[in-house]
């Protein structure tokens, strides 16, 4: 089933990409209205939008999905129900396709809720307590966004149709559209894990690694960004951009700091995803929706490759995800190491790789835009942090001595895993330049002073050096993380966000429930209710029973008592 799914997904991916580029060249969009049924002149119509953006995005989703499924052929080979796993992944892709081609909030909700439900099934795929808790956190965080979309559907009843794309320029000044835009922003923030909904993304790493490669690169987490790209005209009309800009920059900064003090390989990559999502959100808020979409596509390519390399390393190290157990992997797994380093350099924005064409352009546009120094600082400092944790990953996993069992051997022998990685390596190297030529027929012309032009490269170099400084291990054990323990605890736990969004949110209702149970259900409620009534009736019945059992004694005692009274009355 893996090979069949790979073949069809790859075929559709190629077809959609060619069609998308053709639609882009001739500037063509297609609306398809499918009438499901008609009742007394009321038609139930399903609408699809087929334009270059939806076609190119679907082709990328299907290309990555095809390689992920092929990769799963080896990664999940010990799984008894691998066909079930593939079916769930295909349901995930179908939900994403619904979301991409829908200009209608009802059909968007089908894809949106489908993504949430299937992602829950995939996060809890390994049956243990950790996976279950992570799945619940993922599902409940995303339910907030689902509720926001449901409320926006209710608000759109005032317009007579749920096709939001028709109302951009006609009722853009209405109060209802303002509320709907706010609700869509809330939904996008939950799905794309922006502050304060960020804690579910690292927790979702409990899913199998092929799922992480698909979900956290091109599908689930980018759904919110894609929805905001579609709603971009509304963001510009109501001037909500400043809010998204601030949240996006804070998310980028927080996740960059957190990744520098994390030791779980998959969580580091998840935090890097969070950082790039913040970058997409922030540049989208300035009105550059095409740039955000461009970075979304390039990021999907190299992030899927990064997860695949991480999966290959974890698979060979018998499911160990701690980077402190790794070391000198470059000698044992050269292909994985090459792919891992190329994708890390793409993430940093190293020149002429896929990430460079989008990330460097975004940073140059920021230099050109009217942003204050705080936002400017957050952008470039977060870029430096990206280089820092990328170099730290290389330092811990690739270089140095092997820290795993001395008698343990591992290699790149798996054909399926290697094929999946090479398929993504090619597009991670050449995809950025190809897309920049195709998506921007007239290239962006950014004229800046030389020091601003070189600022990005300088930031990457300084960030790499900082990554070396904080991870360098000397014999005196003077580690940065031990010298600044409080700071490391704060940043390494995502500014205590998992505690705030789980423990503190649930503490009040859970403690209220506990004391209610103790005081009412198990206390006064029992005393005055079931148990109390039971005890009272048992006592009453026992008392009455004792009276019945003592009838003769009572009669005799009463007779003696009355005889005594009569004696007293007559003889005294």
From Swiss-Prot:
<keyword id="KW-0679">Respiratory chain</keyword>
<keyword id="KW-0999">Mitochondrion inner membrane</keyword>
<feature type="transmembrane region" description="Helical">
    <location>
        <begin position="6"/>
        <end position="26"/>
    </location>
</feature>
<keyword id="KW-1133">Transmembrane helix</keyword>
<feature type="transmembrane region" description="Helical">
    <location>
        <begin position="234"/>
        <end position="254"/>
    </location>
</feature>
<keyword id="KW-0830">Ubiquinone</keyword>
<keyword id="KW-0472">Membrane</keyword>
<feature type="transmembrane region" description="Helical">
    <location>
        <begin position="208"/>
        <end position="230"/>
    </location>
</feature>
<feature type="transmembrane region" description="Helical">
    <location>
        <begin position="179"/>
        <end position="201"/>
    </location>
</feature>
<feature type="transmembrane region" description="Helical">
    <location>
        <begin position="372"/>
        <end position="394"/>
    </location>
</feature>
<dbReference type="InterPro" id="IPR003945">
    <property type="entry name" value="NU5C-like"/>
</dbReference>
<dbReference type="GO" id="GO:0042773">
    <property type="term" value="P:ATP synthesis coupled electron transport"/>
</dbReference>
<keyword id="KW-1278">Translocase</keyword>
<dbReference type="InterPro" id="IPR001516">
    <property type="entry name" value="Proton_antipo_N"/>
</dbReference>
<feature type="transmembrane region" description="Helical">
    <location>
        <begin position="268"/>
        <end position="288"/>
    </location>
</feature>
<feature type="transmembrane region" description="Helical">
    <location>
        <begin position="524"/>
        <end position="544"/>
    </location>
</feature>
<feature type="transmembrane region" description="Helical">
    <location>
        <begin position="422"/>
        <end position="442"/>
    </location>
</feature>
<feature type="transmembrane region" description="Helical">
    <location>
        <begin position="552"/>
        <end position="572"/>
    </location>
</feature>
<feature type="transmembrane region" description="Helical">
    <location>
        <begin position="86"/>
        <end position="106"/>
    </location>
</feature>
<feature type="transmembrane region" description="Helical">
    <location>
        <begin position="147"/>
        <end position="167"/>
    </location>
</feature>
<keyword id="KW-0812">Transmembrane</keyword>
<dbReference type="Pfam" id="PF06455">
    <property type="entry name" value="NADH5_C"/>
</dbReference>
<dbReference type="InterPro" id="IPR010934">
    <property type="entry name" value="NADH_DH_su5_C"/>
</dbReference>
<protein>
    <recommendedName>
        <fullName>NADH-ubiquinone oxidoreductase chain 5</fullName>
        <ecNumber>7.1.1.2</ecNumber>
    </recommendedName>
</protein>
<comment type="similarity">
    <text>Belongs to the complex I subunit 5 family.</text>
</comment>
<feature type="transmembrane region" description="Helical">
    <location>
        <begin position="44"/>
        <end position="64"/>
    </location>
</feature>
<keyword id="KW-0813">Transport</keyword>
<comment type="function">
    <text>Core subunit of the mitochondrial membrane respiratory chain NADH dehydrogenase (Complex I) that is believed to belong to the minimal assembly required for catalysis. Complex I functions in the transfer of electrons from NADH to the respiratory chain. The immediate electron acceptor for the enzyme is believed to be ubiquinone.</text>
</comment>
<feature type="transmembrane region" description="Helical">
    <location>
        <begin position="291"/>
        <end position="311"/>
    </location>
</feature>
<dbReference type="Pfam" id="PF00662">
    <property type="entry name" value="Proton_antipo_N"/>
</dbReference>
<keyword id="KW-0249">Electron transport</keyword>
<feature type="transmembrane region" description="Helical">
    <location>
        <begin position="454"/>
        <end position="474"/>
    </location>
</feature>
<dbReference type="InterPro" id="IPR001750">
    <property type="entry name" value="ND/Mrp_TM"/>
</dbReference>
<dbReference type="GO" id="GO:0005743">
    <property type="term" value="C:mitochondrial inner membrane"/>
</dbReference>
<dbReference type="GO" id="GO:0015990">
    <property type="term" value="P:electron transport coupled proton transport"/>
</dbReference>
<feature type="transmembrane region" description="Helical">
    <location>
        <begin position="107"/>
        <end position="127"/>
    </location>
</feature>
<feature type="transmembrane region" description="Helical">
    <location>
        <begin position="337"/>
        <end position="357"/>
    </location>
</feature>
<keyword id="KW-0496">Mitochondrion</keyword>
<feature type="transmembrane region" description="Helical">
    <location>
        <begin position="479"/>
        <end position="499"/>
    </location>
</feature>
<keyword id="KW-0520">NAD</keyword>
<dbReference type="GO" id="GO:0008137">
    <property type="term" value="F:NADH dehydrogenase (ubiquinone) activity"/>
</dbReference>
<dbReference type="Pfam" id="PF00361">
    <property type="entry name" value="Proton_antipo_M"/>
</dbReference>
């Amino acid at each position: 089933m893996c090979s069949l799914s790979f073949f069809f997904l790859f075929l559709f991916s190629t077809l959609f990409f060619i069609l998308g580029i053709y639609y882009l060249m001739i500037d063509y969009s297609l609306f398809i209205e499918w009438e499901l049924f008609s009742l007394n002149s009321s038609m139930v119509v399903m609408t699809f939008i087929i334009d270059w953006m939806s076609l190119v995005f679907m082709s990328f989703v299907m290309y990555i999905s095809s390689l992920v499924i092929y990769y799963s052929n080896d990664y999940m080979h010990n799984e008894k129900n691998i066909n079930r796993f593939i079916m769930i992944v295909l349901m995930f892709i179908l939900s994403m396709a619904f979301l991409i081609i829908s200009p209608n909030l009802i059909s968007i909700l089908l894809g949106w809720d489908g993504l949430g439900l299937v992602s829950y099934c995939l996060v809890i795929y390994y049956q243990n307590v950790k996976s279950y808790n992570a799945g619940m956190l993922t599902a409940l965080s995303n339910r907030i966004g689902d509720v926001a979309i449901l409320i926006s559907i209710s608000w759109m009843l005032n317009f007579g149709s749920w096709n939001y794309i028709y109302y951009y320029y006609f009722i853009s000044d209405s109060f209802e559209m303002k509320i709907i835009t706010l609700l869509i922003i809330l939904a996008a923030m939950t799905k794309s894990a922006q502050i304060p909904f960020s804690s579910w993304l690292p927790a979702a790493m409990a899913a199998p690694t092929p799922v992480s490669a698909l979900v956290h690169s091109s599908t689930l987490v980018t759904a919110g960004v894609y929805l905001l790209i579609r709603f971009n005209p509304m963001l510009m009309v109501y001037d909500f951009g400043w809010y998204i800009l601030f949240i996006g920059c804070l998310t980028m900064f927080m996740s960059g700091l957190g990744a520098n003090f994390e030791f779980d390989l998959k969580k580091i990559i998840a935090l890097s995803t969070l950082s790039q999502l913040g970058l997409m959100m922030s540049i989208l808020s300035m009105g550059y929706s095409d740039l955000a979409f461009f970075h979304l596509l390039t990021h999907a390519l190299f992030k899927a490759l990064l997860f695949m390399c991480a999966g290959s390393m974890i698979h060979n190290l018998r499911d160990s995800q701690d980077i402190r157990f790794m070391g000198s992997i470059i000698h044992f797994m050269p292909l994985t190491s090459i792919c891992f380093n190329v994708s890390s350099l793409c993430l940093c924005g190293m020149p002429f790789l896929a990430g460079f064409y989008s990330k460097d352009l975004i940073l140059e546009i920021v230099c050109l835009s009217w942003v204050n120094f705080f936002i400017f600082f957050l952008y470039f400092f977060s870029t430096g942090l990206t280089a820092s944790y990328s170099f730290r990953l290389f330092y811990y996993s690739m270089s140095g001595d092997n820290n795993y069992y001395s008698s343990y051997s591992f290699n790149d022998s798996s054909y399926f895993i290697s094929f999946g990685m090479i398929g993504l390596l090619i597009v991670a190297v050449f995809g950025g330049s190809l897309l920049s030529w195709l998506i921007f027929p007239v290239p962006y012309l950014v004229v800046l002073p030389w020091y601003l032009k070189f600022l990005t490269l300088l930031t990457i170099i300084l960030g790499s050096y900082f990554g070396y400084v904080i991870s360098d291990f000397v014999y005196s054990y003077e580690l940065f993380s031990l010298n600044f323990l409080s700071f490391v605890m704060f940043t390494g736990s995502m500014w205590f966000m998992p505690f705030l969004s789980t423990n503190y949110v649930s503490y009040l209702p859970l403690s209220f429930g506990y004391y209610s149970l103790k005081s009412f259900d198990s206390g006064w409620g029992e005393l005055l209710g079931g148990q109390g009534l039971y005890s009272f009736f048992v006592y009453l019945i026992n008392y009455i029973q004792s009276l019945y059992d003592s009838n003769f004694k009572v009669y005799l005692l009463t007779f003696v008592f009355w005889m005594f009274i009569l004696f007293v009355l007559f003889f005294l």
